[in-house]
């Protein structure tokens, strides 16, 4: 697998597609590893399209949609205390401004490979992803190392604090609590390059994707600061959890020397 942040939801898109396509239309539940809550995806029973091509495409769209929701939950879980490595807080990364845009791009890249027939098996998928990433970065007008460092210097004190060190949460000062899968990148003040809009479909061939499967977050014994739900958290609850995080960060975020 490849290391950039957008490849994690890309890999999840491929993984979910490989499970969804053979079972499309069946009722079943996929259980994933815990992230504070126990992560489950419940797939509803429905009559899938009669066309092989439409079944394939619907499976791919549903996989990309769910992979992005997994990425959204990861941001929420990080803020509420999830740690993939014991003793190392991940709060610094929660809702950082580039995360969900990059995650959405990863889901889109994987979706493109699947729809183009460039992910027939895991090896084929990995090879195809290696090829598509450079062209995607070119389209996004990725900048060379020196220009990137100059921007880091310009936004020091606005987006991040060079006086802090990992894992201090407020090394990152700028966060984006907007969760939707219709996104522009968050741009620094003064950036004039037109942003690239990314989105995922909500409907395909008359099927509302959100009605085909439900992402469920069930309580565990290790919820850290995550409130315990009455039954389980679902996608409809994500915005409230993110808004609570935003309000607390707004109160506790240190004042900076620029644009405060």
Predicted segments with their positions:
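Divalent metal-coordination and catalytic microenvironments
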Residues: 75, 99, 105
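Hydrophobic/aromatic-rich structural module bridging two neighboring secondary-structure elements via a short loop
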Residues: 95-96
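Bulky hydrophobic segments
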Residues: 1-92, 111-260
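Long, domain-scale functional regions
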Residues: 90, 102-103
């Amino acid at each position: 697998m490849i290391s950039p942040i957008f490849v994690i939801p890309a890999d999840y898109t491929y993984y979910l597609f490989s499970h969804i396509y053979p079972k499309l239309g069946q009722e079943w539940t996929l259980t994933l590893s815990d992230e504070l809550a126990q992560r489950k995806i419940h797939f509803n029973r429905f009559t899938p399209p009669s066309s092989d091509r439409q079944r394939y495409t619907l499976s791919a769209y549903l996989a990309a949609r769910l992979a992005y929701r997994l990425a959204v939950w990861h941001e929420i879980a990080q803020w509420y205390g999830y740690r993939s490595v014991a003793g190392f807080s991940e709060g610094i990364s929660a809702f950082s401004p580039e995360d969900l845009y990059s995650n959405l791009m990863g889901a889109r890249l994987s979706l493109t490979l699947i729809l183009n027939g460039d992910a027939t098996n895991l090896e084929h998928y990995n090879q195809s992803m290696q090829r598509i990433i450079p062209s995607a970065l070119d389209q996004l007008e990725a900048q060379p190392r020196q220009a990137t460092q100059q921007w880091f210097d310009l936004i020091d004190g606005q987006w991040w604090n060079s006086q802090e060190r990992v894992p201090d949460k407020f090394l990152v000062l700028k966060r984006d609590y907007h969760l939707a899968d219709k996104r522009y990148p968050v741009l620094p003040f003064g950036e004039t390059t037109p942003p690239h809009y990314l989105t995922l479909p909500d409907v395909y061939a008359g099927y509302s994707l959100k009605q085909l499967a439900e992402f469920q977050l069930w309580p565990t014994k290790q919820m850290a600061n995550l409130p315990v739900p009455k039954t389980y958290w679902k996608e409809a609850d994500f915005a409230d959890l993110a808004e609570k995080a935003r309000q607390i960060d707004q109160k506790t975020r240190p004042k900076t020397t620029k644009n405060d």
